[in-house]
């Protein structure tokens, strides 16, 4: 199957799943879920749905269980939308990209603060040395 067709299928699945989660899935565990992307296997039998979940690890695990319980319903929505021989079996996983980006941002901010603190210390030392009188005896 062409990669272009797989990309189109992945985008269609992402759209159907995202819309169904927002408008049709009634499970409160999936309330804070955002669909980030979908990867479809070459034979179109499996689709890995990457999601982002607001909350702590407990909330993420609950949301994944809620999504897994809703997988059959979501697959039926996909089957109605796509004209393929097989409807992909959905697997859900939390996309850690957002968390990793936040961690990197925090580390960079900390490094920047340390640099600014070191620069301020040097400036104070420099100004202190310049302020002392020099005798030319």
From Swiss-Prot:
GO terms for biological process: maturation of SSU-rRNA; ribosome biogenesis. GO terms for cellular component: cytosol. Pfam families: RBFA. InterPro entries: KH_dom-like_a/b, RbfA, RbfA_dom_sf. Residues 112-125 have a biased composition (Basic and acidic residues). Its main location: cytoplasm. Belongs to the RbfA family. This is Ribosome-binding factor A. It comes from Rhodopirellula baltica (strain DSM 10527 / NCIMB 13988 / SH1).
């Amino acid at each position: 199957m062409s990669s272009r067709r797989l990309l189109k299928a992945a985008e269609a699945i992402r759209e159907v799943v995202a819309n169904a989660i927002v408008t049709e899935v009634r499970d409160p565990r999936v309330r804070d879920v955002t669909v980030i992307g979908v990867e479809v296997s070459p034979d179109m039998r499996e689709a890995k749905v990457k999601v982002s979940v607001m909350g702590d690890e407990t909330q993420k695990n609950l949301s994944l269980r809620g999504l897994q319980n809703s997988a059959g319903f979501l697959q039926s929505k996909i089957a109605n939308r796509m004209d393929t021989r097989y409807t992909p079996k959905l697997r859900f996983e939390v996309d850690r990209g957002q968390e990793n980006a936040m961690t990197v941002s925090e580390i960079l901010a900390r490094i920047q603060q340390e640099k600014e603190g070191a620069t301020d210390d040097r400036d104070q030392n420099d100004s202190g040395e310049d302020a002392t009188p020099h005798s030319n005896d």
